[in-house]
Each structure stands twice: as C-alpha cells, then as structure tokens.
Amino acid sequence: MAGAIIENMSTKKLCIVGGILLVFQIVAFLVGGLIAPAPTTAVSYVAAKCVDVRKNHHKTRWLMPWGPNKCNKINDFEEAIPREIEANDIVFSVHIPLPSMEMSPWFQFMLFILQIDIAFKLNNQIRENAEVSMDVSLGYRDDMFSEWTEMAHERVPRKLRCTFTSPKTPEHEGRHYECDVLPFMEIGSVAHKYYLLNIRLPVNEKKKINVGIGEIKDIRLVGIHQNGGFTKVWFAMKTFLTPSIFIIMVWYWRRITMMSRPPVLLEKVIFALGISMTFINIPVEWFSIGFDWTWMLLFGDIRQGIFYAMLLSFWIIFCGEHMMDQHERNHIAGYWKQVGPIAVGSFCLFIFDMCERGVQLTNPFYSIWTTDVGTELAMAFIIVAGICLCLYFLFLCFMVFQVFRNISGKQSSLPAMSKVRRLHYEGLIFRFKFLMLITLACAAMTVIFFIVSQVTEGHWKWGGVTVQVSSAFFTGIYGMWNLYVFALMFLYAPSHKNYGEDQSNGDLGVHSGEELQLTTTITHVDGPTEIYKLTRKEAQE
C-alpha cells in the first residue's frame, strides 16, 4: 500500500528537506536585504508658477519650469498684482524628473500625491466642503529637444480637507492651513524619459469654480516610483522561480496521473495552487521594459488575487478532508460555506480594483476616493471583503481545532499497536501537525514582516552593513510562499514506496478494526490508504 511522500519519508530525510528549504528561505531574505536597494524612491517637486498671457487658453501650450525654453515665471502671487496677471493666466509647471536626470522603464510605475500650501486670509477663507478644480495636462518626450506629446488632459476635482489650528484673527494672517495630502496621479508604466505637468486653476465666480479655496501659495508634488535596482533583482527572482515551480508542478501531476485512479480533490487543489503560483511567477514584466503596458499594475493585482484565493481555499479543503466522512469528502460542493466567503470577498476586491486602476488606464488622474459616492462605494466593497475574511478565518480556526481534537482522540488507540506501527503513526501525526504549524508560521511571518517594514525607517545598519528591511520583506515573503507551494507539491505527491503485507491493517493492534490514517491522498486502486482515516471515524461518530 502506497502513501504520500510525507508519510513514507523518514524523520531524518524530512529534516534534511526542511533544512534545504530553510537555506533557500534565508537566501531569499538576504537577496532583498543585502543586494537589492529600497523598493521605491520618493522625489519632492515644487511647481513653478509660469505665466501664460495668451488671450485664450483653449489650445494646449507647454510651459517648462527650467531649461533653454523656460517659461516666464513669478515667485509669488503678490508679484502678479502689480503686473496685472490674473489667476487664469498662472500655470503650475512640474518637470519629471528633476534637472540632469531621466526616467527609465525599470521604474515600472509612477504615483503622485498632491500637497497644496494655502495661507489664511480673513477675506479669503476656505469654505466648508471646498473643492479645488484643476485643469491638468500631462505630456512626454524622449529627448530634450523634441516637442511635447500630450498623454492626458483632464479636469481633476479634489476636495480640500484643511484645518487651521490658530485663532482666526488678523495677527495670524499668512499662516498656513494644515491640509491633507491628495491623491493626484498614477501611471502603470514609465515608457518615456521626460514628463511635464501643467496645472491650471481656472476661476469662474459665476459657476463657483475655485471660489472659497483660500489663498494658494504653492503646489507641491511627491512622486513615488520603483527603484530600478530593485526591479532587476525582482525580475531575476521571478525568472529563477518560474521554472522551479513549473518543473515540480509537472512532476507532481505526472505522479498523480500514473496512478490507476482519478485525482482526488486535495490533489487537484494542490495542483491548482501550483498553477496560480506559476501564474504569479511568469516574468511578463520583462516586456514592460520595451512596451508601454500601463495595465501591468492591474494585471499584477489580479494575479495576486487568484493566488491568495487558491491559498485560502487550499487551507480550508486541507483541513476539511481530514474531518469529513467517505460520502462528503472529495467534493468541492461540500465546502460552499467556507469557500463562499472567499469568492465573495475576492469579487468585491476585484470590483474595487477595476473601479480604481481599471479607470486609471484611460484617466491617470482618477481616484475613487475623491468623491463622496466613490468613497462610500469603495468602503462598502472593502467592508464586505473584510467581513468575508473574518468569516473565513472563523471557519478555518474551527476546522483546525476540530482536526487537532480528532487526532488527539485517536492517539488513545496508539498504545495498543505494535511498536513499529505505533512509531509509524506517531510520525504521521507529527508530520501533519508540523505542516499545520509551518502554515501558521508562514502566515505569521507575512504579517510580522509587513508590520516591521511599515514601522521601521526602511533599513537597519549593523556596523558597515546596511540591511534594506522593506526589500527583504518583499523578496523574503515572495520566496517563502514559493517554497511553501514547492514543499506541498513535493511532500504530498504519491510515493512509490509500498508497505509489506506484515504491515496490513491486521497488524495495527486496533481491535475495533478501524484503519488509522492521517492525510487525504488516495493512492491504492481499491480505496483510501495512508491518508485520512485517522480522523474519519471520529467525524462519523
């Protein structure tokens, strides 16, 4: 009678496999911590105040803040009054990147947030629910001499959320409001070397456009993009891991198909988990270096969503296959209560992502959070997804508790067995608990490293060595889940090792005649083998 590899592997060999995987895990963390730079870089920009004195501003004219063709600038708005420059003639210009630098496709994406400096004036205060309306043009070019090509031109409304901490008295005029930063722009590729933003604040008192927004002093932008060095390390990891997971996946399914019976549910789920991991690993990002694929961020979100949905489903089915009886097991329909919240939560997050990054494919300035309706809709999707996640973990914790309770109850049968069989089943129980604890450790490490990467400065210094904590988090956790899936497909593949007849059920020493098993893989042509019977009878009772 055959079983899964994990059932027939000696403790020594299991420790060797675990040690090898641990070494690869440490290497994954070290690659990010010692080789890769920080994942992202933030660059601050202050918009230059250019003057566009044309009679009409309907035709786009690109105004450069610096360089040989720089615009006619003013330092502040006080200078505009004696020169009879109207608010509609002022254009806030930002060149990306800073002088003597250029952007690169290795940066992968650009994310910008907006900070508006607004001074307090008694006769020009920010009214309640004030909204600033910006006319924004985004252009690009690939050298310093070509004409700018328009990439996007949109009206961008943003609600101002500002507070003034001092008393609103004449002596405090000129002090700045404390305003929340605003989402401004996100682009899913960096296909060009130079970008130019021209921001206008058109004033129309009749239509109440840009009226009651205070006295704007400056517009500041913070641009965030992925570091090119980190991108290269990330691509290298994906390129290395893709064939590794693909090969073990093919090997695993080949061993399944060599059996004289159809695959069982758990085997199918493990294989599907391998497919979803391979889907994440395939380094299609290499094409983004040569092609302007702005949809790569959305595509990456979808790939991650599929993997995590499969991972959560695997945990439920893995536990459930150790509890259900022969009639209930091996059918996905038996898990609709547990898998249902996963499907609903994943669908809600998918809709939210499509409403945000899906729209940004045509309008990079769009954000679902900028309107009251959009904010309520986004919060509704997130809350529903959060409720589904909580329900899922309640189901999962209950099922894990049930499995461990059933196994503990069955351990009372072990003393009646022969020494060889007792040691064998003690090993099986140990390995099952070991896998459950490893799963818990992987989930805990993901949460812990995420928290650490958020609360630390981004790097640690030990002597002369600098460790990039955030990069180590990304590469380490990414490598960890790859190793987890690799270990699942290796350890739960059917073993070709057979037990002798002397280790048949009659030698168990269990007078009730029940067969003790631990996992759920069925590898004998006539029925279940070394997989799940240890807990099945308890569930039936």
UniProtKB/Swiss-Prot annotation:
Segments passing through the bilayer: 16-36, 233-253, 269-289, 304-324, 332-352, 381-401, 432-452, 472-492
Q: Which GO terms describe its biological process?
A: anterior/posterior axis specification; cementum mineralization; exocrine pancreas development; hindbrain development; intracellular protein transport; mesoderm formation; midbrain development; positive regulation of canonical Wnt signaling pathway
Task: Work out whether the entry's keyword set contains Transmembrane helix.
Answer: yes
Q: How is it modified after translation?
A: N-glycosylated.
Q: Where is this region: Interaction with Wnt proteins?
A: 101-202
Has keyword Transmembrane helix? yes
Where can this protein be found? Golgi apparatus membrane; Cytoplasmic vesicle membrane; Cell membrane; Endoplasmic reticulum membrane
* Principal cellular location given in the protein's record: Golgi
Q: How does it sit in the membrane?
A: Multi-pass membrane protein
All ranges on the Lumenal side of the membrane: 37-232, 290-303, 353-380, 453-471
Q: Which GO terms describe its cellular component?
A: cytoplasm; cytoplasmic vesicle; dendrite cytoplasm; dendrite membrane; early endosome; early endosome membrane; endomembrane system; endoplasmic reticulum
Which tissues carry this protein?
Expressed in the brain, skeletal muscle, heart muscle, lung, gut, liver, and kidney (at protein level). In the brain, expressed in the cortex, striatum, ventral tegmentum, nucleus accumbens and to a lesser extent in the Purkinjie cells in the cerebellum. Expressed in eye iridocorneal angle.
Show which residues sit on the Cytoplasmic side of the membrane: 1-15, 254-268, 325-331, 402-431, 493-541
Q: Listed GO molecular functions?
A: mu-type opioid receptor binding; Wnt-protein binding
- At the top level, the lineage of the source is Eukaryota
Which InterPro entries does its entry note?
Answer: WLS-like_TM, WLS_GOLD, Wntless
How would you summarize the oligomeric state and partners of this protein? Interacts with WNT3A. Interacts with WNT1, WNT3 and WNT5A.
PANTHER family membership: INTEGRAL MEMBRANE PROTEIN GPR177 (PTHR13449), PROTEIN WNTLESS HOMOLOG (PTHR13449:SF2)
Q: What does this protein do?
A: Regulates Wnt proteins sorting and secretion in a feedback regulatory mechanism. This reciprocal interaction plays a key role in the regulation of expression, subcellular location, binding and organelle-specific association of Wnt proteins. Also plays an important role in establishment of the anterior-posterior body axis formation during development.
What is the protein name for this chain? Protein wntless homolog
Organism equals Rattus norvegicus (Rat)
Which classification does the entry list for the species?
Eukaryota, Metazoa, Chordata, Craniata, Vertebrata
Q: From the UniProt record, report the name of the gene that encodes this protein.
A: Wls
